Amino acid sequence: MSLTAYNHVPLPSFMYGTAWKKEATTQLVQLAVASGFTAIDTANQLIHYQEALVGEALQALAKKGIKRDTLFLQTKFTSIDGQGGRAPYDSSANLATQVRQSFDSSLVHLGTEYVDSYVLHAPISRRGLGAADWEVWAAMEELYRSGKTKRIGISNVAAGQLAQLCEQAN
């Protein structure tokens, strides 16, 4: 089953999640695709994900003839609070730079020139959306406009935060 995103681009109804797979990530991603998964969810968050090992799996799958454009790749930007002290970006940089650095690192890890979906892993603000959330979102919108991601999204939000984002996002 496929859904349609806000920009009329197909969206898979389920994805294989790669959190907490550790050193088994490469093998398990290959097994997931062999078992019928066509969408892979990861994040540039070393405390819980091994995004570079997802990239190794994608390289192995390519050698077996599975083309990049047949797979849906989703990754996420995680703010410094969720990084466990191992941020994939300069934590002293402004948030827009952190988003770009994390995204560029994800492209290298995954061995691709674009992702199908880039998600804000969680808002920085506990209630509502604050200035920091909007700075991150604006950087993500810029990545969308550049064509480096086909869609953007958010996870781990309260209903009110999602409503606010839908009302005010560009």
What does each model-identified segment do?
Residues 81-85:
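Short acidic/His/Gly/Ser-rich catalytic and metal-binding motifs that mark active-site loops
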Residues 20, 87-170:
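Glycine/proline-rich, positively charged
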Residues 1-71, 75, 113, 139, ...:
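N-terminal binding-site loop/beta-alpha segment at the start of enzyme catalytic domains
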